[in-house]
């Protein structure tokens, strides 16, 4: 009989007994089913051995769970960004709460010559060590920043647009009201204030800046946003088309295409700390808008390979999700998914405070990824991304398959099909027409809710890495402006019966307010919720309704556009500026909420005002005053 030695040298058991013990289905069976010939003392020894073994295993597994990390993709940032985060932390700790500076103003600093990063880091180490873990005095910190850094925005220089004319020929000829016309000229003139170029020092010494080099001049949004932003640029270009500034518009597209060429996708914004995420994919729509006016085939030919590159980014890897419908058909859709699982450099203190309630590294990393992903959506922040709104810590953006993202990608498929046809590639065009039809089918199956008359975001049951079966209860039945985004697509707004349902739903939704369309019905304190309204959503819904052949839809579109124009006018007359967002529950009030102060300028707001005035004009008899 073959025997095996165990931990107790005095214990011998047969092969049969050994197998019976160690193939037992439960460790408790093992502990309490000792062979009868084993003495009591030996049974006790074995019991304590297995007891301590189980305790050790449990403790080890708990420690492992505390040290588990998020395995998703992370794009590394630069040494300068990492260092500026330290400066930002020190600054926000030094200032009194009521005087807290904008954290982004520190991450946008550039190194002053002749100092190197290592020299400044060494000086900063000395500065903070002298404070003995106490806040650095504000005066001392300000002196340090002034000595070693050039101010935020100093590496972005004013640029006079070559194609700006103060009163272009035929400009807004259908705006008959002279008061409105004069205001429209002032809005048109704001392009000069927002036109900039990246300084030569950024091209020559990129490692001294967080601003990225770009080949052409830019139109920035304004205020704290001292760089070009991806999805903002679409509505800026809509306005530039009205202003007949075609060279400037092409320059914006050229800049974004250069980012796609370098990174494989258009960045959230042209900063080193934005390389970990994109924004709503509207590059193809920008190219289409410009071609539609200029018939520039060379621009189309240059754009196609880069649009294919961007299309691949949004339809592969973590961005890609597959939803199987009741008939077993797999729908390939997309979600936002930032390549980052740490605090956002531009708001790192805010993000760290928000994550402070989580106990494990894995929870914090997932939360940070969901925050960065909300930023990739452009709608940062909103209850739309929260599992338990308005609890900010329940942010779960990567679990949402958003209606509007897939609208943008459907538009991209249609745009690429059109451009390939223009360039003579009929086979390529046919492929993208087929892709667009497949995605449009998903709008009917995955997003559409017949009872609501809206398209609803879909919440994933799992991580999204495997296909999952569609469930009705996974649709988010809360009302958001984005639920109506598909009406922007011509193949959808041409369906009269569908449009009538959507018009009824929008009318009864509670979203239509005195100054435009609410972003949501929830007043959460977040800026992409009630009572705010935003230019992009106004334009998409108004344009979609206006293109329909349904009379009620056209009338609704014009009514919303006039409300939006009027409120922007009243805010401008009151404050002297155009704002990033409006409080649409009242006429003539700008919006607030979120993690920064209200911003002015403002790129996409200007663009939508001009586009609406071009489309709808303003009769001489119609007053624009409150």
From Swiss-Prot:
Cysteines engaged in disulfide bonds, as pairs: none
Any GO BP: trehalose catabolic process
Ligand binding (alpha,alpha-trehalose): 224, 232, 268, 277, 279, 344, 346, 580, 595
Tissue: Highly expressed in flowers. Expressed at low levels in leaves and stems. Expressed in guard cells.
Keyword annotations of the record: Cell membrane, Cytoplasm, Glycosidase, Hydrolase, Membrane, Nucleus, Stress response, Transmembrane, Transmembrane helix
UniProt-annotated catalytic positions: 380, 580
GO MF terms held by the record: alpha,alpha-trehalase activity
UniProt-listed SUPFAM superfamilies: Six-hairpin glycosidases
Substitution effect: residue 128 to A: Abolishes trehalase activity
Entries under InterPro entries matching the protein: 6-hairpin_glycosidase_sf, 6hp_glycosidase-like_sf, Glyco_hydro_37, Glyco_hydro_37_CS
Cellular component aspect of the GO annotation: cytoplasm; nucleus; plasma membrane
EC nos: 3.2.1.28
Residues annotated as transmembrane: 20-40, 45-65
Reactions catalysed according to its record: alpha,alpha-trehalose + H2O = alpha-D-glucose + beta-D-glucose
Assembly: Forms homodimers.
Other remarks on this protein: Plants overexpressing TRE1 exhibit increased tolerance to drought stress.
Listed name of the protein: Trehalase
Native organism: Arabidopsis thaliana
Gene assigned in the entry: TRE1
């Amino acid at each position: 009989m073959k025997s095996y030695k165990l931990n107790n040298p005095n214990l011998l058991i047969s092969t049969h007994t050994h197998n019976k013990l160690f193939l037992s289905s439960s460790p408790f069976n093992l502990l309490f089913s000792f062979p009868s010939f084993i003495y009591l003392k030996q049974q006790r020894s074995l019991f304590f051995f297995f007891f301590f073994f189980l305790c050790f295993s449990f403790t080890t597994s708990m420690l492992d769970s505390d040290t588990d990390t998020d395995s998703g993709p992370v794009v590394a940032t630069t040494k300068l960004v990492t260092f500026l985060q330290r400066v930002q932390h020190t600054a926000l700790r030094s200032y009194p709460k009521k005087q807290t500076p904008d954290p982004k103003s520190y991450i946008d600093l550039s190194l002053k010559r002749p100092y190197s990063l290592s020299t400044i880091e060494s000086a900063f180490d000395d500065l903070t060590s002298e404070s003995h873990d106490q806040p650095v005095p504000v005066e001392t910190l300000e002196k340090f920043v002034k000595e070693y850094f050039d101010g935020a925005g100093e590496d972005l220089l004013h640029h006079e647009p070559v194609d700006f004319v103060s009163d272009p020929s035929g400009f807004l000829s259908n705006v008959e009201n002279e008061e409105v016309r004069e205001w429209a000229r002032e809005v048109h003139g704001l392009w000069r204030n927002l036109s900039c170029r990246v300084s030569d020092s950024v091209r020559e010494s990129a490692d001294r800046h967080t601003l990225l080099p770009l080949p052409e001049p830019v139109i920035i949004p304004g205020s704290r946003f001292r760089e070009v932003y991806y999805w903002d640029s679409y509505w800026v270009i809509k306005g530039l088309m009205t202003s007949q500034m075609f060279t400037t518009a092409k320059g914006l597209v050229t800049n974004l295409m250069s980012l796609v060429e370098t990174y494989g996708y258009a960045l959230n914004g042209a900063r080193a700390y934005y390389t970990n995420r994109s924004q709503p994919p509207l590059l193809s729509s920008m190219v289409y808008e410009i071609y539609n006016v200029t018939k520039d085939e060379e621009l189309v030919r240059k754009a196609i390979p880069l649009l294919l590159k961007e299309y691949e980014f949004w339809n592969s890897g973590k961005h890609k999700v597959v939803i199987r419908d009741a008939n077993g058909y797999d729908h390939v859709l997309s979600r936002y998914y930032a390549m980052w699982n740490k605090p956002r450099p531009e708001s790192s203190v805010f993000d760290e405070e928000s994550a402070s309630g989580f106990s494990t590294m894995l929870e914090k990393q997932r939360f940070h990824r969901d925050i960065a992903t909300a930023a990739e959506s452009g709608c940062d922040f909103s209850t739309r991304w929260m599992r338990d709104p308005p609890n900010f810590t329940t942010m779960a953006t990567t679990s949402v398959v958003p209606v509007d993202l897939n609208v943008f990608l459907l538009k991209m498929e249609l745009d690429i099909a059109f451009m390939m046809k223009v360039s003579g590639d009929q086979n390529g065009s046919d492929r993208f027409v087929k892709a667009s039809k497949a995605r449009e089918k998903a709008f009917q199956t995955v997003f559409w809710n017949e009872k609501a008359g809206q398209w609803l975001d879909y919440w994933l049951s799992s991580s999204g890495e495997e296909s999952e079966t569609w469930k009705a209860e996974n649709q988010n039945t809360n009302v958001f402006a984005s639920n109506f985004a598909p009406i922007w697509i011509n193949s959808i707004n041409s369906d009269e019966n569908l449009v009538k349902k959507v018009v009824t739903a929008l009318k009864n939704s509670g979203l239509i307010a005195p100054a435009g369309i609410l972003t949501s019905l929830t007043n959460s304190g977040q800026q992409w919720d009630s009572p705010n309204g935003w230019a992009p959503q106004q334009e998409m819904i108004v344009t979609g309704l206006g293109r329909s052949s349904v009379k009620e839809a056209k009338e609704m579109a014009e009514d919303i556009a006039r409300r939006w124009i009027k409120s922007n006018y009243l805010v401008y007359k009151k404050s002297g500026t155009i704002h990033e967002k409006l409080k649409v529950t009242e006429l003539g009030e700008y919006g607030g909420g979120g993690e920064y102060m209200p911003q002015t300028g403002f790129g996409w707001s200007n663009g939508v005002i001009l586009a609406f005035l071009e489309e709808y004009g303003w009769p001489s008899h119609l007053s624009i005053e409150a």
